[in-house]
Amino acid sequence: MQLLYYIYEEPVTIHLGTWISLGDIVIPFGLSLDSLAMTVIVPVGIITLCVLAYAIEYMSHDPNRNRFYIILSIFAVFMTILVVSDNYLMMFIGWEFVGVISYLLISFWSTRITAMKSALSAILLNRMGDTFFVIALGLMINYYHAVDYDTIALVTPYMNTFLLNTLGLLLLLAATAKSAQLGLHAWLLQAMEGPTPVSALLHAATMVCAGVYVLVRSYMILEYTPTMLLIICWLGGLTTLVSGLIAIVTNDIKRVIALSTMSQLSIMVLAIGISAYDLAIYHLYCHAFFKALLFMGAGSVIHSFVAESQDMRKYGGLIEYLPFSYTAILIASLSLMAIPGLTGYYSKDIIIESLYGSYTLSGYILYYIAVGSATLTSIYSLRVLYLTFMGVPNANKASYSHIHESLGMMIPMIVLVIYSIFIGYSRDSVIGHYALSLPANNGFIETEYTLPAYIKLLPLILGLTLSAILVYVYEYAYKINRSAVYDYLNNRIYYEQILNNIVIRNTLRLGGYMNAYIDQGLLKVLGSTGVSRAVTYINVIVIINILYLFFI
């Protein structure tokens, strides 16, 4: 597919047939190999291959490993369908199936009750997003009489503003669920109960990016809805800040990385909110590699422990036992922190700068929020490195007795290390070549050459300064008492408790009332019970009349 794109140097559409034809509504079945699809399909293919190679060793002792490889391969097929489809309906098929496969992979270790609960939570929250996607599809078919990207792009300028705002809101809600934005984000942390290769592929590099991909693919709608773009901006800003605050007090190594994924997805959402779609996709492109590497490095640490603990407080001193894993996590963390010279610096900081370069009140405020988030990213990245690899061992001797590196897991990690270092240097070629199909938005060029140096360097300076303070705290001031703020963040701002107490419990109570007073009450009286009693009553009346006539 990449070869076709480079040969023709323009979008290539492969028409496979007509799927649905009802009057003037024609829904095609085909593939669209444009710049956007080709940019996203590259990390999907490379990381899927690396994860499958990594899983050979990681899952080598699992009796159900063949089923795992089959499900993971099927996921790659449907993720590809989601990306290269030429219409929203085909995209929705891929969207649905990656959600179902995510459920199967999170619950892969089905004997763990926590894994089953987490999988159920993940699929239910994702189904909420799917519902909004279905409604958006219905509106497109009703008003556009089409769901293919080209037709929608051509007709959108003539559509009603209210309809476009409604479509933008529905697609945003769908993306909020899939890309774990604030409000529908709880499933991503719970998804860490699945095997680590699943986290590296689905919950870092591919599936969770589907929401961002849908928003970028829907740029032709969003560009006519400035109100929705502002909402998207603020949603991304709040999510990136909240996820960073929660991450600095989280002790589960995979959950910290999941929260960093949530934060980086929010940076992409921020870019979409200022119409910098090319920057959003480029950050998605780069982020996939170093985030998959982070998960693989964490998996190497977890796999080497006898009890496979994920609590960083039980680690310590592992740099002596796992030097390669330390190097891999260090490179990925520095890239995540946007240290100059590494991939993350070239894709992440330009988005933060562009917020300031938008020259709007919201842009200025969100710039400082994003700077705060970038600072928190540096803090929790360093915290992972310190608690895991530095200091003294915190587990018992037996846990350290069999720790070793695995060559089978190292080889795919080496590939991702190379990408995490060097892929950032391709920014100009990716933005200049791949983004041809996106709206003409050259704001980042003005940002690059007009902003003062301190605006550009502020995230880096704050991140390094507060990281140094964090090292001092861990070394010399570790007896600081836990505060109410710590407990608030450690409980993930009590989101799950609020959701359970206000939404879930009241919904169940409403369901109970509906069952008692409608299903078992009104409907039962008018339905089965009422009919039964009526028949019995009629039979009695008939018998009485017959007896009366007989005696007469």
From Swiss-Prot:
Q: Where are the transmembrane segments?
A: 11-31, 36-56, 68-88, 89-109, 121-141, 152-172, 196-216, 229-249, 256-274, 287-307, 322-342, 365-386, 406-426, 453-473, 532-552
- Sorted alphabetically, which keywords does the UniProt record give? Electron transport, Membrane, Mitochondrion, Mitochondrion inner membrane, NAD, Respiratory chain, Translocase, Transmembrane, Transmembrane helix, Transport, Ubiquinone
Q: How does it sit in the membrane?
A: Multi-pass membrane protein
EC top class named in words: translocase
**Gene Ontology terms, MF aspect:** NADH dehydrogenase (ubiquinone) activity
Q: What is the reaction catalyzed?
A: a ubiquinone + NADH + 5 H(+)(in) = a ubiquinol + NAD(+) + 4 H(+)(out)
**Entry GO terms, CC:** mitochondrial inner membrane; respiratory chain complex I
As for subcellular location, the record says:
Mitochondrion inner membrane
The UniProt entry's GO biological process terms, in alphabetical order, are:
electron transport coupled proton transport; mitochondrial electron transport, NADH to ubiquinone
The EC number(s) this enzyme carries = 7.1.1.2
Tell me, in one coarse class, where this protein mainly resides: mitochondrion
The superkingdom of the source organism is Eukaryota
Function of the molecule: Core subunit of the mitochondrial membrane respiratory chain NADH dehydrogenase (Complex I) that is believed to belong to the minimal assembly required for catalysis. Complex I functions in the transfer of electrons from NADH to the respiratory chain. The immediate electron acceptor for the enzyme is believed to be ubiquinone.
Family to which the UniProt record says this protein belongs:
Belongs to the complex I subunit 5 family.
What NCBIfam families does the entry give? Answer: NDH_I_L
Protein name stated in the entry: NADH-ubiquinone oxidoreductase chain 5
- Give the organism the record lists: Candida albicans (strain SC5314 / ATCC MYA-2876)
Which gene holds the coding sequence for this protein? NAD5
